[in-house]
Amino acid sequence: MCLAQCAARRLLAQVHGALKPAPKKPNWCWEMARPSSNMADFREVFAKAKHIAIITGAGVSAESGVPTFRGAGGFWRKWQAQELATPGAFARNPSRVWEFYHYRREVMLSKHPNAAHIAIAECEKRLRKQGRSVVVITQNIDELHRKAGTKHLLEIHGSLFKTRCTNCGNVTANYKSPICPALAGKGAPDPEIEDAAIPVEELPQCEEDGCHGLLRPHVVWFGETLDPDVLTEVEKELDLCDLCLVVGTSSVVYPAAMFAPQVSARGVPVAEFNMEATPATDRFRFHFEGPCGTTLPPALARHESEIIA
């Protein structure tokens, strides 16, 4: 990639680095033929790929029973996620926001990777032995890819199971259940339940020596910018890939919405696996409709040309 293209991409990352919805009609500036749903053709492309980038969204975890808090009915109590997942909401009512995230953490502790997560992890393990690479770039914060065994994982929106201190900035993995005594039994989503109104000093606190600052979930909230180091890694992997899969994502949240179209624009095959078409579908070479746990395993299974080590 030339220096001008690199500079342009970095500029896009700066402009669109904040988590926000994409326009209703993305202004893509390139045209392609209608995507194919021919699995045999995809498998031939897959067999030749050396560096595969897999971009995943909420749809890949839906079959694990993970609540998405998107669309109609996507409420926790009286609020939608967009009302709670903001710096302002946390500043105004950290107890309410922590109840919401505590509920999500507790739910996720009982969930397991589905066939799509496992297919990705097994593909990565198998291809690594052949000198080929797979990287997963996920918008999900549920860590199901990690549970499935994925090693090369970029979590662009953070993780439910990491905390960040609002005082010292320390980031720590945290799988405690409950995350603090005051949140035990709290966070039920019933709209009739009142907020627990937990005092700040009883909410999760930093355990670094002498700090005791208030912890927050280490996730990217609406209006916040993505970690520039993570974006740099994403950029590097997308520049390197010779095949890109977009799995279970609606392609309507920036900056992830532009990742695969940018890859497609430089001539790299992109395959979309989703329950329905998205605003970006026509920019890709392949589109496979249906549950990811059904469509993805045969797509990533061992090809007859692969040599078993």
Curated annotation (Swiss-Prot):
Q: Which residues form a coiled coil?
A: none
- Annotated Deacetylase sirtuin-type domain ranges read 36-306
One GO biological process this protein is involved in is:
protein desuccinylation
Q: Among its keywords, does the record have Repeat?
A: no
Where in the sequence is the transit peptide found?
A: 1-35
Pull one GO CC term from this UniProt entry.
mitochondrial matrix
Instruction: Provide the domain comment.
Output: In contrast to class I sirtuins, class III sirtuins have only weak deacetylase activity. Difference in substrate specificity is probably due to a larger hydrophobic pocket with 2 residues (Tyr-101 and Arg-104) that bind to malonylated and succinylated substrates and define the specificity.
Protein name per the record:
NAD-dependent protein deacylase sirtuin-5, mitochondrial
